[in-house]
Amino acid sequence: MDKLKKHEQICKELNSLYCRKNADYGDSFGKSYEEFGPVIAAIRMGDKLNRYKALIKGRQQVNDESVRDTLIDLANYAVMTVVEMDMQSGGDAE
């Protein structure tokens, strides 16, 4: 598989995970973003980045999340933040 196809596959995976989590938890990120603004995105992504750093340094204490899982979550938080920014501005970045 070439890198363009792999990127497309990962983006589909991101969307699938986003849909499943929204079905389970509702739009909790959107509600938090509405209440606290961009700072909530920085906090959530900061938590994931700290988790990533702990994993790559071998300091993991919980075995149920891999480096890949953490990076997927981090990517989804970045996309969700762009969605909230676009929704607030009433625009679509396309």
Predicted regions and their residues:
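Intrinsically disordered, low-complexity regulatory regions
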Residues: 1-94
